[in-house]
A protein has these predicted regions:
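Hydrophobic alpha-helical transmembrane segments of multi-pass integral membrane proteins
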Residues: 66-70, 93-130, 306-314, 328, ...
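Alpha-helical transmembrane segments of multi-pass membrane proteins
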Residues: 97-110, 137-154, 180-185, 189, ...
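Hydrophobic core segments of alpha-helical transmembrane domains in multi-pass membrane transport
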Residues: 7-19, 30-39, 69-72, 106-111, ...
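Interfacial loop-to-transmembrane junctions
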Residues: 90, 94-95, 299, 408-430
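Hydrophobic transmembrane alpha-helices of multi-pass solute/ion transporters
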Residues: 1-72, 85, 89, 93, ...
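Short helix-coil transition sites and intra-membrane helix breaks within transmembrane domains
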Residues: 22-25, 60-63, 74-84, 111-123, ...
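Long, contiguous bundles of hydrophobic transmembrane helices that form the permeation core
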Residues: 2, 39-40, 182-294, 408, ...
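Re-entrant/interfacial helical elements at transmembrane boundaries that shape
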Residues: 71, 85-87, 119-131, 160-172, ...
Length: 442
């Protein structure tokens, strides 16, 4: 093992350990990046001011509008009582027994509708908070449910999902987003069912221990009296959600169909979120005094979330430029076994090393894709299987403690790694990892 590869492993382990212990990723990530750089013989200032800051800044440049608007949307829904009304209505409709499903299903629908998982975290959390309060469940169980719905099958396995993890393989294998539908459906079953069973087991475990919902001291929510709100107020929670999904998917199509304009996805999500915010505000005009404070709190809250994520991305940027990363890539690409198994291992390892599903998969496929496409010799079935295994594998080791989505989810929910990461790890890391490797061996 080269010293540089050892540095990557040491830096990664240190990053995960300190993040799990609750230390701020804002200083932990650059320190761990420096460890990687020093052991790789890389200039410290070049690594920090150059590669680290560039990776961090590029991420903020790309994602800040979505984080900002997503946080504002979530806070408007929260402080106006719309999220609470919708959450209470869902609990009344299906009962507190199915509180987990009431959180997981909306996450699945929104991510399958094309909404970024980062945005879903901001949008769903206020509603989930209300659902878990109404069901008297520990709020520390909520991140696991959100992660299961947002970071799982609709990100990688469901046929036709518009998430980037399902789009990247099409460039390498000439496939479509519907690739390997049967394999995809099997993957959905073996990933979602165990995850849901686990979450329900955690609920039963918490009830046996006598645990209850404990309000988050940092969660500022107007104490709306349910009797003071009209019985139809839950509509103010569901309509903005529908508007966001429809605008994200329908508006770009209409623009292209009738004006010949191709709207970029990052522009589309901004327009959709602005539409959702405006509709939420219009439906709650009777609470006009609440709206500006909600927008202000949402804007402030978005900064911490995106900085946590961007710092983790900066660490991955340093890892990718040191010599040891080439060694890691070589190990991943030369795994014994079938091409499907080799691909599954490679994508998982590189997604874990970079802390990014799309980043790890892009690196793996840029090296593996042409080679495997050639080995498939035009066999459509094999190419589609390669597509699906790559996509599913990207959602395995990516959700280690330093993953940006994990950090965002924990920051938004004000939970620590120690309190909630185990549920995220089991449902979005261990189960997808085992599933991807198992399916690759079939």
């Amino acid at each position: 093992m080269s010293l540089s590869l050892f540095g990557i492993i040491l830096g990664l382990v240190l990053l995960m350990f300190l993040a799990y212990k609750g230390y701020s990723i804002i200083w932990v990530a650059p320190v761990c990046a420096v460890v990687v750089a020093v052991l790789s013989g890389y200039a410290i200032l070049d690594a920090y001011i150059g590669d680290y800051m560039k990776g961090m800044a590029d991420y903020v440049l790309q994602w800040f509008p979505a984080f900002f608007l997503g946080a504002v949307y979530g806070k408007v829904m929260d402080l106006t009582g719309s999220a609470r009304s919708l959450g209470n209505a869902l609990v009344k409709l299906i009962g507190p027994r199915f509180a987990v499903a009431a959180v997981v299903i909306p996450c699945l629908l929104m991510t399958y509708g094309g909404i970024s998982l980062f945005v879903v975290v901001f949008v769903i959390y206020p509603m989930g908070y209300s659902i878990y309060r109404a069901a008297d469940l520990p709020r520390t169980l909520l991140p696991g449910a959100i992660a299961t719905g947002a970071f799982g099958i609709t990100m990688t396995a469901v046929p036709g999902t518009p998430q980037i993890q399902n789009l990247i393989p099409t460039d390498y294998y000439g496939t479509t987003t519907m690739a390997a539908p049967l394999l995809s459906l099997v993957a959905c079953a073996v990933m979602l069912l165990p995850a849901y069973i686990y979450l329900e087991w955690r609920v039963r475990q918490s009830r046996r221990k006598g645990l209850h919902f404990v309000p988050d001291p940092k969660h500022k929510e107007v104490d709306h009296d349910s009797k003071a709100l009209p019985s139809w107020h839950w509509v103010t929670g569901i309509v903005p959600l529908v508007v966001v999904v429809l605008m994200l998917n329908l508006f770009p199509w209409l623009l292209n169909r009738f004006a010949g304009i191709e709207l970029a996805s990052n522009y589309a999500i901004v327009i959709a979120l602005v539409g959702g915010i405006l509709v939420a505000c219009l439906l709650n005009l009777n609470q006009a005094k609440t709206l500006l404070p909600a927008i202000n709190e949402g804007a402030n809250g978005s900064m911490g979330a995106i900085m946590n994520t961007a710092c983790a991305v900066g660490f991955g940027s340093v890892v990718k430029v040191v010599p040891g990363f080439a060694s890691l890539t070589s190990i991943a690409l030369n795994m014994p076994g079938s091409i499907l198994f080799s691909e599954a291992v490679a994508v998982n390892l590189l997604a874990g090393a970079t802390g990014s599903a799309s980043g790890g998969m892009s690196i793996a496929l840029s090296a593996l894709g042409p080679k495997y496409a050639e080995m498939a010799a035009g066999n459509t079935g094999v190419l589609e299987a390669l597509h699906r295994i790559a996509s599913i594998s990207s959602g395995g080791l990516d959700t280690l403690p330093h993953n940006g989505a994990v950090l965002t989810l924990l920051a938004v929910s004000n939970c620590t790694h120690k309190e909630s990461y185990i549920d995220i790890c089991i449902t979005t890391c261990i189960i997808p990892l085992v599933s991807s490797l198992g399916l690759a061996l079939i």
